[in-house]
UniProtKB/Swiss-Prot annotation:
Zn(2+) binds at residues 36, 186. Its main location: secreted. Keywords: Disulfide bond, Hormone, Metal-binding, Pyrrolidone carboxylic acid, Secreted, Signal, Zinc. Growth hormone plays an important role in growth control and is involved in the regulation of several anabolic processes. Implicated as an osmoregulatory substance important for seawater adaptation. The modification Pyrrolidone carboxylic acid is found at residue 18. One of its GO terms (molecular function) is growth hormone receptor binding. The gene is gh. Belongs to the somatotropin/prolactin family. It is found in: Secreted. Transmembrane segments: none annotated. This is Somatotropin.
Amino acid sequence: MDRVVLMLSVMSLGVSSQPITDGQRLFSIAVSRVQHLHLLAQRLFSDFESSLQTEEQRQLNKIFLQDFCNSDYIISPIDKHETQRSSVLKLLSISYRLVESWEFPSRSLSGGSAPRNQISPKLSELKTGIHLLIRANEDGAEIFPDSSALQLAPYGNYYQSLGTDESLRRTYELLACFKKDMHKVETYLTVAKCRLSPEANCTL
């Protein structure tokens, strides 16, 4: 009897439940992918720090705290309270811009190991997934009226020939910013996904 009631309940939802199910599935995939990238970013940054002398770590961290990531030019919530107040569409849009801003710089993170070579393709997959989520919520044309405006300049002169100290600083900056941005995207997508469950507690 319970099984029959359950089947009738599912059937009564009809087609209207399908978009929610699809949305949850897409969000789950996107969150899983950005979690993988965030963990990878943390590992790469930790490995790089471990290769430095204590004084080098201290100096580089001091410089980085006074510097900015390229993605800081992308307007995003300033704290967890603003993040929670932001709409799903806004969080998706910001996440898309953050991921897109790494398409070119991520090439310098590739090479040397299998995990590093996963970065660019994983970013591309994540970008596609977020775009699908945006289109499921609203016409993508309204979110990205001018895609050229989303392109940020490469990270300083990272791609030029640099001295040892400057090269260390650029590598530190690149890895630290990548870790920071993947954490942002993970947070935004997790909150947006939570909004699909009205009874869920989305407190950060």
